[in-house]
Amino acid sequence: MRKLFFCGVLALAVAFALPVVAAPKAPADGLKMEATKQPVVFNHSTHKSVKCGDCHHPVNGKEDYRKCGTAGCHDSMDKKDKSAKGYYHVMHDKNTKFKSCVGCHVEVAGADAAKKKDLTGCKKSKCHE
């Protein structure tokens, strides 16, 4: 009976630990995105409460996380490009299938004016330098 109990506890421990071990390692902080007029320094550690899939989307049905501006993804740097290829659009549009940076920040800031300025402002915000 003890062996069976021990095996059950061990199986549960492995089952709960597996997703943590299998999760992709986030890139180092200080990722500088310079495709916009005002560069953004992105820190994954600041966003650790957000699931990878909340920002990154599957590529060919796989969770193949890549940089947003990777060739074939959001590689159109034309600010007026409102398609899914438009880099500016996917970062700033509040109504995309996957949450944009600004869309998520608006939600997080809520009605707090100071947070709104910090998280959604173009100049002197916590995003743009």
Curated annotation (Swiss-Prot):
One GO biological process this protein is involved in is: anaerobic respiration
Q: Where, per UniProt, does this protein localize?
A: Periplasm
One Pfam family matching this protein: Cytochrom_CIII
Q: Does the keyword Magnesium apply?
A: no
Q: Which domain of life is it from?
A: Bacteria
PROSITE patterns, per database record? MULTIHEME_CYTC
* Cellular component, GO, one term: periplasmic space
**Which InterPro entries does this entry report, sorted A to Z?**
Cyt_c_III (IPR002322), Cyt_c_III_dom (IPR020942), Multihaem_cyt_sf (IPR036280)
Leader sequence residues: 1-22
| Chain positions recorded as heme c 2 binding sites | H57, C68, C73, H74
Residue positions binding heme c 1: H44, C52, C55, H56
Q: Which Gene3D superfamilies match?
A: Cytochrome C3
Protein name as annotated:
Cytochrome c3
